[in-house]
């Protein structure tokens, strides 16, 4: 969450507006990210229908996303995708678009496809810095 918030703050400082999207299960994480970003960030996690989310993603210039359903929505509607892969792999579930950048550390322990790190460190995400993501924006 702190990496997303750091990236979001940088983007807001560069003049961008941030929309946080996701389901009800994403509300707590999105609230934490939104609170860290502050002004310039609109938290819509759990507050939109899937059709609303599709429309909003279609209006966006680009989407920074983890490997998720909304990543595939962004690819389908033609919005530029910056896809962050930690424990998953673009080899198995890539965004189906030519307008995508994949950001992954491709560690020896990944992909493990686990929500909880079996090694207890989550280096696949913790070491994937906001600066690395900014390089492909």
Positions of PLM-derived features:
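Nucleotide-sugar donor-binding patch of glycosyltransferase catalytic domains
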Residues: 43-44, 75-137
